[in-house]
């Protein structure tokens, strides 16, 4: 039957292929009594080790193909497998109740899932999904059942699923998987972000694709408009084949812009930079003509290991990045651990609301030995290129002043040791807390630059967790309140002669770009694959014309009105 389903455009492009329905199998686990406890423990240990091997391989594959930030979720899954509460709980059931490993795994994981899902905090609820995903993998090894890997698909398909886990998305083979559509998800969900890195057309949040589509149905996924067509007519197939060809031609045109500067129609230069997680990610920045790195997430140096990285390890990583960028600006964010990123070896206490808790600069100012080691490595690397330092999650001037004072102390120590340090390192802050945006005029006097972290700024301003499906409709980048905060930050910085960048998903959003350009944003930092489309868009825009347009948008009532105004005026 013919259906037209609308959802959220997550990754641009057009896919036309037969549907592959990806549903999780339900496996009934029965409780059985055992007599040989040691054999059962050995079986569990083997399943845990095989699961770790798989996750390490997936993590490495994801890091190589999509960057360290996309691989972060698998480091979290590995931490679950090493969690003594979970592992010892399962072993305890086997030893004390003489039950089979499969049922012990089910009982303990179900208990943790129920506990996390009952909490009010959305971050803790997300941990339930991690435990469910990891437990499914371990169970598969215990009972010898394939856990539904999509890596084995060997014909052209469009995947239809309720949702795709990070493990699922990381294993997609672009040669055969032409696109996907899901019932749930938003533009900032894991699967959406990964689909953009892989350049696979995707539509998410449709609410009904699994209900309306049968295995083998012909499907069109329009990741440009957010439309899924089931069993299309010949005319629709022809029209979308033309649309797909036009999009591929457009990509070829974008490729010609790799060595070109990012200038507007009226000759204004805007810096298009990239977000990275490891030195390896610089490959993608250079291949896509990035003019700098607007966010180097240093926490990936600290993850998937059992001890803190040394000063020397960090120095080598930072040095490699600034050297390879050959004088182009590299903004390096100091450690942002906490919230959705944990380090097992720090043994931080569990928090009910870690996103608003002991994280980022708050952790660094308390655990100064960690902070000072990182700052020494950054200061040493500063002589090898255009390195800038950025402090995350700054809420007060006192935090900023303390961080700068510690950095100055470490600089003085290095100089006294005869170590060269650049005398022109710019220091800035992430603006991701609404109070910081409102007080930007105060901060602007004491920093060299701002970088607006919209992913957190939006969810904190709208009081809506971007990963929570039930309130995802409130995650509105174009909401007048968000635009006014951005405007406030830019004006405050410019009044002090300072520059402003943006390093959230919003920076690479084609609807947001005209607004941000009109508001005067100086630097747009995005995923490397978004740089060339953004550069192409800038060539068609006039910065001077956009100034009154952006101010007009600030006066509108709703995010929808803002979006429609931009689309009607600039995205016809």
Swiss-Prot record:
Its EC number is 2.7.3.9. One of its GO terms (biological process) is phosphoenolpyruvate-dependent sugar phosphotransferase system. Signal peptide: none annotated. InterPro entries: PEP-util_enz_mobile_dom (IPR008279), PEP-utilizing_PTS_enzyme (IPR050499), PEP_util_AS (IPR018274), PEP_util_C (IPR000121), PEP_util_CS (IPR023151), Phosphohistidine_dom_sf (IPR036637), PTS_EI (IPR024692), PTS_EI-like (IPR006318). The keyword Cytoplasm applies. It catalyses: L-histidyl-[protein] + phosphoenolpyruvate = N(pros)-phospho-L-histidyl-[protein] + pyruvate. It is an enzyme of class 2 (transferase). One of its GO terms (cellular component) is cytoplasm. Its cofactor is Mg(2+). Belongs to the PEP-utilizing enzyme family. Homodimer. NCBIfam families: PTS_I_fam. This is Phosphoenolpyruvate-protein phosphotransferase. It comes from Halalkalibacterium halodurans (strain ATCC BAA-125 / DSM 18197 / FERM 7344 / JCM 9153 / C-125) (Bacillus halodurans). The lineage of its organism: Bacteria, Bacillati, Bacillota, Bacilli, Bacillales. The gene is ptsI.
């Amino acid at each position: 039957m013919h259906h037209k389903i609308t959802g959220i455009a997550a990754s641009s492009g057009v896919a036309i292929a037969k549907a592959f329905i990806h549903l999780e199998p339900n496996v009934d686990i029965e409780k059985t009594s055992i007599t040989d406890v040691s054999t059962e423990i050995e079986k569990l240990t083997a399943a845990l080790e095989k699961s770790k091997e798989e996750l390490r391989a997936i993590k490495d594959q994801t890091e190589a193909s999509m960057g360290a930030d996309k691989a972060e979720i698998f480091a979290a899954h590995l931490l679950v497998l090493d969690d003594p509460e979970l592992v010892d709980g399962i072993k305890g059931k086997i030893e004390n109740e003489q039950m089979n490993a499969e049922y012990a795994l089910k009982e303990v994981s179900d208990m943790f899932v129920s506990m996390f899902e009952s909490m009010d905090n959305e971050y803790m609820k997300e941990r339930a999904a991690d435990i469910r995903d990891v437990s499914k993998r371990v169970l598969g090894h215990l009972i010898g059942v394939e856990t539904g890997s999509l890596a084995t698909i060997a014909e052209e398909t469009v995947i239809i699923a309720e949702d795709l886990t990070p493990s699922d998305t990381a294993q997609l083979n672009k040669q055969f998987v032409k696109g996907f559509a899901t019932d749930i998800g938003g533009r900032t969900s894991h699967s959406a972000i990964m689909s953009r890195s892989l350049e696979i057309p995707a539509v998410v949040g449709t609410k009904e694709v699994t209900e309306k589509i049968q295995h083998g149905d012909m499907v069109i996924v329009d990741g440009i408009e957010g439309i899924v067509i089931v069993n299309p007519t010949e005319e629709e197939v022809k029209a979308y084949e033309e649309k797909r060809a036009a999009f591929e031609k457009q990509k070829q045109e974008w490729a010609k812009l790799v060595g070109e500067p990012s200038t507007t129609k009226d000759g204004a230069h805007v810096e298009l930079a990239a977000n990275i997680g490891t030195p390896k990610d610089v490959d993608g920045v250079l291949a896509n003509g990035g003019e700098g790195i607007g966010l180097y997430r240093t926490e990936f140096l600290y993850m998937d290991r059992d001890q803190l990285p040394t000063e020397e390890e960090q120095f080598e990583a930072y040095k490699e990045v600034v050297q390879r960028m050959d004088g182009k600006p590299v903004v390096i964010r100091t450690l942002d651990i906490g919230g959705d990123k944990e380090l097992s070896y720090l043994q931080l206490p569990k928090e009910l609301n870690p996103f608003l808790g002991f994280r980022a600069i708050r952790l660094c100012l308390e655990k100064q030995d960690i902070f000072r080691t990182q700052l020494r490595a950054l200061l040493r690397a500063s002589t090898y290129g255009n390195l800038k330092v950025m402090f995350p999650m700054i809420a007060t001037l006192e935090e900023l002043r303390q961080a700068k004072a510690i950095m100055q102390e470490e600089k003085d120590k290095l100089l006294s040791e005869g170590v060269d340090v650049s005398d022109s390192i710019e220091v800035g802050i992430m603006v991701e807390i609404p109070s910081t945006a409102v007080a930007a005029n105060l901060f602007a006097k004491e920093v060299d630059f701002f970088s607006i972290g919209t992913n957190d700024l939006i969810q904190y301003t709208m009081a809506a967790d971007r990963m929570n499906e039930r309130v995802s409709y409130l995650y509105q980048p174009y909401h007048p309140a968000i635009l006014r905060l951005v405007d406030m930050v830019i004006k405050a910085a410019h009044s002090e002669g300072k520059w402003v960048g943006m390093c959230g998903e919003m920076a690479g959003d084609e609807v947001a770009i005209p607004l941000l350009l009109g508001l005067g944003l100086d630097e747009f930092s995005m995923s490397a694959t978004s740089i060339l489309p953004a550069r192409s868009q800038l060539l068609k825009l006039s910065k001077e014309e956009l100034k009154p347009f952006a101010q007009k948008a600030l006066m509108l009532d709703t995010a929808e009105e803002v979006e429609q105004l931009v689309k009607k005026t600039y995205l016809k």
